[in-house]
Structure formats: C-alpha cells, structure tokens
C-alpha cells in the first residue's frame, strides 16, 4: 500500500524485504513499474545503495504476535542491527529517516488512551517482550541519531492496522476472525473478550505515515558542543521528530469485533473462548491529539466499513472452497 501511494506521488521506490513474514504477491503488480525495484534482502546485513536516496522508511520486523513469537531472536536483531543499518544508510545519503514503531511500546497500559508522553508498562522478559523491547530500542537509537548526528528522523507508533493484503494466517484478530467465519469455524476469543483494541484501516494509516514523512522539519540549525549536537527544539513536545501515534481512537472490545465480523460475513460460526496469552494487553486506544495538531490527520474509514472491505479481499484470497 505504501509503495503504491509513493509511486502515485511520482517517487522512485526501492523495496528491500527478506519476505520472512511478507508475501511477494502484495507487490507483484508493481514488478514491471519503471520506478519500482524489489530486492530480496535482510536489513540486518550491510545496506548500501548506489544512487541518491531522499528517504529511508524502516518497516522491517515481524509484527504480529504469531510471527514474533516464532522468530523472537530475529525480531530483536531487526530492532537493533536492522535499525542501525537503516539509520546508517540514511546518514550516509543525507536522507530523511522514518521508523515504523508500534503501540506495543506501551505494553499493557495503565493509562487509556495512550499519549506519546506515556512511557508504558512493559514486561521486558515476557514472550511479547521481544517485540516491545525491539521497538523501544529502535526508537532510542533513532532519537540518538537525531540528537547526535543531526539526522532528520521521524517515528510513527502504529496502532493495529488492518485491511486488504493481510495474510490470512498472520494471527491477528481481524484476519483470524474473518477467515474462521468464512470457513464456518468457531471464532477463537481470548479470555472473555472484554479486552479492547483500536483498529485503523490501512488507507488511513498510509495517509498518516505519508503526512509524517513529508512534513517539513522543525529542527533549527545544529550547535555542536564537544561531541554532542544540541538542538533548541529537539525535545519540544510537538516536534515532528518525536514519536507520533497513528491509529483510530474508536475503541472496541474483542467480542464486539467478533460480532461485526459475523455480521459482515453472514456466518453462523459460534464463539470459542480460549485462555488469554501471557501479557496480552487489556486495553489499547491511541491519543491522536499530536497527529491532529501537527498534521491535521485523523482516520476516516469506520471499523465496520474496513471490515467489509477486508472480508471481500480475504474471501477472494482464501478461495471459494469450504467458505460459507
């Protein structure tokens, strides 16, 4: 989706992905485009590009619980080594850098909704901690490059994106519920389903990411003291260089999401209640005040409409066999 929108803007796009959790079918329609190139590559390795680079967007990482629990060490390596390599490329090219972070940096929050100023409630040694801490470290390194090297950096904290091109088996609640409903299988609800989530449709999320990416820098000229760059505005609360929440503040319970999916699919699937995973967050809702103030951005697509569009996609992707 992001590559599509960048190409529509007239950008040249070089996409690097090792496809550990990705699907090449999501970009197959772009492979013949004159301004698009794809290289299968692991960002944890040395990253070098011959041509000039205007922006480096670092989205590499397993991102669903199913994936980062299957690849815990690689998830940590991407957050550390991958972020370092991507930042190094941006610095070498004098490029703008954007880090895709996550609402998981807030852990199982004790504050709801979560503003960017909230430091989170994270268990660093839990199974989920590999993703939480990988992204927290990536944010710290990104801010260090901004403060020390003067790199123009951006950080977006993404809250639960969904929509077409999701993997049917990615383990996320929306795709899991939809596929189960289409197949007439029970919808597996963790716990009693009272835990809440806030889901943002992919088109809205991409619009927010691009608004952050193309927003002018508010950093004043650098003043160097010894080995440290000091910026008058570097730590201002509403600096574009500080993390920005992107998500839909429309908070729903998991049970309500199941109901919406059943209605959208016309399925009669029953609900099956299973134990909640360790450190599964009880609430999740973004405070998007900073995005509204700085970018004039807010999501437009409702959860119900987004789920209908996603059902249409997954119905085609999964295939007609054994579907209700």
Task: Tell where the protein language model's regions lie, with residue ranges.
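N-terminal Rossmann-like NAD(P)+-binding domain of SDR-like oxidoreductases, especially those catalyzing
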Residues: 1-161, 181, 213, 283, ...
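Short, conserved catalytic or interaction motifs in soluble domains
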Residues: 21, 164, 248
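Residues that form or flank phosphate/diphosphate-binding pockets in enzymes
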Residues: 22, 47, 168, 252-256, ...
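Residue-level signature of the cytosolic catalytic core of signaling kinases
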Residues: 32, 126, 166-170, 250, ...
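C-terminal substrate-binding subdomain of Rossmann-fold SDR/epimerase-dehydratase oxidoreductases
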Residues: 41-42, 85, 160, 181-324
